[in-house]
From Swiss-Prot:
This is Ubiquinone/menaquinone biosynthesis C-methyltransferase UbiE. It comes from Shewanella denitrificans (strain OS217 / ATCC BAA-1090 / DSM 15013). It catalyses: a 2-demethylmenaquinol + S-adenosyl-L-methionine = a menaquinol + S-adenosyl-L-homocysteine + H(+); a 2-methoxy-6-(all-trans-polyprenyl)benzene-1,4-diol + S-adenosyl-L-methionine = a 5-methoxy-2-methyl-3-(all-trans-polyprenyl)benzene-1,4-diol + S-adenosyl-L-homocysteine + H(+). One of its GO terms (molecular function) is demethylmenaquinone methyltransferase activity. NCBIfam families: MenG_MenH_UbiE, PRK00216.1-1, PRK00216.1-3, PRK00216.1-5.
Length: 251
């Protein structure tokens, strides 16, 4: 059953009204936006750069393509795609959170990335783009925060061109028991302390750890993508499945 099929959904380990989740998630990212990049480096020990580089390589963007970096936050993927698609291409950095968009826009403009990137505040469940518009859609570490993931996947399928691909980079389920135990200890004991020290906000990082545990596992997300209409869906585990990259096509 889709999370959007009832009036309740998960916000971390809490059960909340479905129509309240977006505001609750927004408050988390308003709080951490300014230190988001620093926390990514610290809490992943820099490994998030490898995960994102693999995503870019898998996307195989070419000059002239249109790319949607959904839940793109501070623009790490957008910056790479901007160079790959060139002057004839287009990259849209979309995020539901205006604080994250502002940080991303400032960071990319400071890097001189201005000509082929646009910024759109958008809800993944109802994307404000035409049908059959993008060659590639990426959503990195954003799907778990969406209230109705099934609706979001259908919305992504709609705006993809036939032959286009969706890449979902997201925290997932470690494959081995020893890694699971170490990951739990890190997520619930160490990560909130880091958040408190760096962002002065332990609660937001407690939510982020909980939201990872509530996110569908690798095979469940694969089935969700297939149900939404994506074909040739598969996934690659990274760092023992702490993160997985799911790929699917529209035909």
């Amino acid at each position: 059953m889709s999370e959007g099929d009832s009036n309740k959904t998960h916000f971390g380990y809490k059960t909340v009204e479905a129509d309240k989740k977006a505001d609750l998630v927004a408050s988390v990212f308003h709080s951490v936006a300014a230190k988001y990049d620093i926390m990514n480096d610290v809490m992943s020990f820099g490994i998030h750069r490898f995960w994102k580089r693999f995503t870019i390589e898998t996307a195989a963007a070419r000059p002239g393509m249109k790319v949607l970096d959904l839940a793109g936050g501070t623009g790490d993927l957008t910056a790479k795609f901007s160079h790959l698609v060139g002057e004839r291409g287009q990259v849209v950095l979309a995020d539901i959170n205006d604080s994250m968009l502002k940080v991303g826009r400032t960071k990319l403009r400071d890097k001189g990335i201005v000509n082929n990137v646009s910024y759109v505040q958008a809800n993944a469940e109802a994307l404000p783009f035409p049908d059959n518009h993008f060659d590639i859609i990426t959503i990195a570490f954003g799907l778990r925060n969406v209230t109705d993931k099934d609706a979001a996947l259908r919305s992504m399928l709609r705006v993809l061109k036939p032959g286009g691909k969706l890449l979902v980079l997201e925290f997932s389920k470690p494959q081995h028991e020893m890694m699971r135990k170490a990951y739990d200890l890190y997520s619930f004991k160490i990560l909130p302390k880091m958040g408190e020290i760096i962002t002065k906000d332990a609660d937001s990082y407690e939510y982020l750890a909980e939201s990872i545990r509530m996110h569908p596992d690798q095979d469940t997300l694969k089935e969700m993508m297939q149900t939404a209409g994506f074909e040739q869906v598969d996934y690659t585990n990274m760092t023992d499945g702490i993160v997985a990259l799911h790929k699917g096509y529209k035909f």
